[in-house]
Amino acid sequence: MYYNFEWDPKKDKRNSRKHGVTFEQAATVFQDPRSLSLFDAGHSVKEEDRWITLGLSTTGGLLVVHHTFDELDTETINIRIFSSRKAVKPEIKQYSE
């Protein structure tokens, strides 16, 4: 399976200033075999399913990433990242269990 990542560069800059996490860093959580992806029913709409993934980045930080999944073909999934931040204590506990 191949992952293709995309994001809005302006949102990436705002997110980096606000949360100290770039979307490039956030994309690395999808390499974590222990990452946990949950459907975000509260923010999904009919036209777009949204997801939240909790995982370890390649820099060692535990991150929460808000994104979409879009299957481009049988081999490729497009992931559009629109928010990311460092995990807080309850999320760290959830990841550890």
Question: Can you name each region flagged by the protein language model?
Answer:
Residues 1-97:
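Ribonuclease/tRNase effector modules and their secretory precursors
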